[in-house]
Amino acid sequence: MSDHVKITPMTLNFGPQHPAAHGVMRLVLEMGGEVIERIDPHIGLLHRGTEKLIEYKTYLQALPYFDRLDYVSPMAQEHAYSLCVEKLLKCEVPIRAKYLRVIFCELTRILNHLLNISSQALDIGAMTPLLWMFEEREKILNFYERASGARFHSAYIRPGGVAADIPEDLIHDIFQFVNTFPKFMDDVDSLLTENRIWKQRNVDIGVVSKKQALNWGFSGPMLRACGIPWDLRKSQPYEIYDELEFKIPIGEKGDCYDRYLVRMAEIRESIRLVEQCLNRIPDGPVKTDDRKIAPPKRSEMKKSMEALIHHFKLYSEGYSVPAGETYMAVEAPKGEFGVYIVSDGTNKPYRCRIRAPGFAHLQAIDMMAKGHMLADLTAIIGSLDIVFGEIDR
């Protein structure tokens, strides 16, 4: 009998109905035994034509579409769109609104990373982190609901400011959350970080070098895990990030384990940012006083005919944005989320292009998984942090 067993190449379908695919993703794998030789990702199963739909909506009506892109971290998308429209309008946002935006964007980052770390752990076989982390996520979703009235699709950050001010008791409750949360993170750390099985499944899996990360267009934790300290909140500061103190966590190897460590460290930095904002937040208005962009108060509408007209015009016709084009990007939890808008001077965008960070990360899956075992693929997909709402758009 021969010592060499001939391995027949095999084509394997992974997804689109697979619990570890993180959405409707189909991967066509070319296998040499149990080793991955090539991966061909098939996307577009969640394509809804968002960019085209936006062309038929007013600038205010287009906003809720952004909540539905990366539906795990909705406020980050709204933020990029609002900043882009404000840049075209040359609209100044009140300082209290800027603080509220940063508070909720950082809570959104925590929301996103909690889901990613817990689902990555579940894919590998650790169930406890998921149950613990979803309990904490529920608290943040409760803050979302108290601020905007919705748990997920909040439409809270709008061009000109935010939808509404938050009550004093909500600020107090966020403070309490911020004070108790680091202890929870220590518990998760003790559960995963030095866990032998967790390290065996993640260390040296899906390694990406600095050069490869830049060539593939990586951003966010995926890029920082490779050792490149690039963060738009530091390199191209927006809102009040230049006034706040925080570090940029970076990795060394660029493997699945480093990506996990970077996200864990980012959660702690986000807590620091929220705490600083809560300590410094000033009183004042939360939306621009230009009534053509932001609606007047209900009390004003009961007294002033002009306020009533502004309200009606805003929600029926919308506002016209000066002709021009601009690109605005924010450091979303998954990476650089960018919005490019072309305005022709009317009340609807002529063109809206969305740059989703997950799209670039998913492209590199063939490069990352080649030569690894099939079982390692779930760890790699889990560490990518992909959501198909933003990839397929």
From Swiss-Prot:
It catalyses: a quinone + NADH + 5 H(+)(in) = a quinol + NAD(+) + 4 H(+)(out). NCBIfam families: NuoD (TIGR01962), PRK06075.1 (NF004739). It is a peripheral membrane protein. GO terms for cellular component: plasma membrane. Keywords: Cell inner membrane, Cell membrane, Membrane, NAD, Quinone, Translocase, Transport, Ubiquinone. It is found in: Cell inner membrane. This is NADH-quinone oxidoreductase subunit D. NDH-1 is composed of 14 different subunits. Subunits NuoB, C, D, E, F, and G constitute the peripheral sector of the complex. GO terms for molecular function: NAD binding; NADH:ubiquinone reductase (non-electrogenic) activity; quinone binding. Belongs to the complex I 49 kDa subunit family. Its main location: membrane.
